Amino acid sequence: MSNPHSNNSKNLKHQNFKGQNPKNLAPTKALRIAIFTDVFLGIPGGIPSSIRAQKTSLEALGHQVTIFCPGTQQDFENPLSQFGANHDPNIILVPTAKFLVNGAPFSKWTKQVVRFIEGKYPNLTESFDLFHIHYEATTSMAGLILAKKYHIKTVQTMHGREDMAIAINVPHPFKTIAATGINLIHRTTLKSISKKSPRPDYQNPEPKKLPGLNYQNAEIKNLAPTIARREMWQMMTRQANLADQVITPSAHFAKKLRLFGVTRPISVISNGISDQEIANFTPRIRTYQDHEPLRILWFSRLSKEKRILPFLEALRIAQELEPNFRFIFTIIGDGNQMSKVQKFCKKHFDEASIKILGTIPHQEILQKYTKDQHLSIINSYQFDTQGLTILEAAACNLPVIYADPDMSEIVPNHGGLCAKSPAPRAMAELLLEIYHQPELIQKLSQNLAASEKTYLQSHQIEKLLKLYRQLS
């Protein structure tokens, strides 16, 4: 698939290592990498999945990977967690608060995390060659502070649109208060290592001058129309500019970060999916007959930002527009909208049309529950920077329908279709287009089968190691 932002290739250090074996790239000296993240690794989701896959791939090449993350031993005793800290000595659980944030453990204040890590590793310089940071909250800030103190190079992966997380999830009267408070804590915590003047980077000895942001600029105004969203963009930009190297999973997100003032070198490297997840099965080409119900799979959080309820509304509208339209919608996942999903389905659909399965071990989803499906759905809009669900579906030759045109960059080889707008009616019309043209399913599935499997972690790790070597 062509890259809609390919004209920015000079700015984005997106290099191609096609055809090379990652084992041939492994240095004679194994790297010692510390990963800092605020994401709880014991839950499903794109970020924890990518961190797990990154750790597995690097260790397979002989590198040492230590992860600092929140959680307790009890959290990792969940049988669904195959990445438990109770049996992996290289997963270090930092001081963790007793309360949960969005149902997941959250680390304590940055100072406490810093003290804990320094107590465990008195001389970090002798223990690690570089840091890789995967978020922007307390543990991630601890990584930046320790990196500056011990002169260790840092890679920062910017995963998500935190501005949209606030805009979608925080009730209206509190959006500005929450965003301003988060940005204030972030700015204050990192004040000691922040520089007012731009600094050179390892690729360009001449520092780039930070331009003043013009919030009347149409593109910036569209991305940051409120004070709350401006505050979160400031936080994301600050975090990125304190690293030596920035990674984003997509070119469209890299472009937005540049727009808001990120001056550090940016590389576009997909989060990738684990090779092991698809190693033991051969996906088939999907076909859809016009007498069949359209089988659609959702495997993601049931949350506002993922927009499960607008998709259910699209299904309702599709049935209203075409009474003969039949479907079976399988929902895998859990989240704070589960009860609303159950109520909506009970009110509008018969039991045969909906299967709510809850949380299922990740590998089982790909190898078992995708088998008889026609479509996968990712319905987020201006939130996901990559959408790992798209890549996982692609690995199964399962066509994808989606609402956000930015996701077209991610869908391999035209293996999906985008609705004309994020409105439920537009998605309903797309569903009916497929219903009336069943041959589309086979065509899209064949496109995915013919695509290069560059989304596998084994391919992405080559690019990551290239960056690591430039820094270490």
Regions of interest found by a model, annotated:
Residues 2-5, 23-82, 87-89, 93:
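N-terminal subdomain of nucleotide-sugar transferases
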Residues 179-245:
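Membrane-proximal helix-turn-helix segments that form the acceptor-binding/catalytic region
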Residues 244, 370-385, 398:
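Acidic donor-binding loop of glycosyltransferase active sites
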Residues 252, 272:
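Carbohydrate-associated surface elements
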